[in-house]
C-alpha cells in the first residue's frame, strides 16, 4: 500500500532493529519493491549481524554512537573499534554509514574521546560539513542536539503541547503493527 507514496523505509523507531532475526530479509524485500531502506541502530549488535546485513546492502546505516554514553562501565574503545570495523567495511561496499553523535546540550563530554577513537581507524584530516564531517567515501560523523522523546508528564513542558516534529512527514509502524 505504500508503493508510490513514499521512497524511504526507516527500520527503527523504538528499540533495536538488529534484534529482529528477519531484518535482512525485510531490507531485501524493501529493495525488491523499489523502496530505499535505512537502518538506525545503537551498534551493539553489528558484529553478530555484519555478514547478513552487508549482504542485504541497505542504502544507509545510521549508528547512534552517542547511545554508548548510557552504558556506565562499558568499554568505549572496544565498542568504537567494532563499530568502525563494520562501518569501514560497509562504506567500502557502497553503503552510506552515518555515525551519529546526537548529544549536543546533554552528555557531549566524551565526544572528543570518541572522535579520537574514530581517528584511529580513519585518520584525519576529514572534510568538514555543516553537520559534522565526511571522514571517507560513504562514511560520515554527524552532530545534532540531544533528542528527548516527548513526554506529557515531563515537569518542564507538562503544560505545553507536546509534538514529535517527525510526524509532519513520517509515520512509524511498531512490530505489533500499530
Where do the language-model regions lie?
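Accessory C-terminal segments flanking Radical SAM cores
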Residues: 137-178
Amino acid at each position: 500500500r505504500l508503493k508510490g507514496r513514499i521512497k524511504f523505509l526507516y527500520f527503527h523507531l523504538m528499540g533495536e532493529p538488529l534484534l529482529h532475526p528477519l531484518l535482512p530479509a525485510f531490507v531485501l524485500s524493501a529493495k525488491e519493491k523499489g523502496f530505499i531502506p535505512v537502518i538506525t541502530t545503537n551498534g551493539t549488535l553489528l558484529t553478530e549481524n555484519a555478514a547478513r546485513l552487508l549482504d542485504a546492502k541497505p542504502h544507509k546505516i545510521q549508528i547512534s554512537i552517542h547511545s554508548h554514553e548510557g552504558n556506565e562501565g562499558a568499554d568505549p574503545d572496544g565498542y568504537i573499534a567494532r563499530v568502525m570495523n563494520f562501518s569501514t567495511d560497509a562504506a567500502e561496499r557502497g553503503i552510506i554509514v552515518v555515525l551519529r553523535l546526537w548529544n549536543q546540550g546533554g552528555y557531549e563530554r566524551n565526544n572528543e574521546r570518541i572522535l579520537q577513537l574514530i581517528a584511529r581507524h580513519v585518520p584525519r584530516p576529514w572534510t568538514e560539513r555543516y553537520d559534522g564531517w565526511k571522514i571517507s567515501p560513504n562514511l560520515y560523523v554527524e552532530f545534532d542536539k540531544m533528542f528527548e522523546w516527548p513526554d506529557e508528564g515531563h515537569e518542564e513542558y507538562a503544560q505545553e503541547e507536546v509534538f514529535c516534529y517527525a510526524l509532519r512527514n513520517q509515520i512509524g509502524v511498531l512490530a505489533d503493527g500499530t
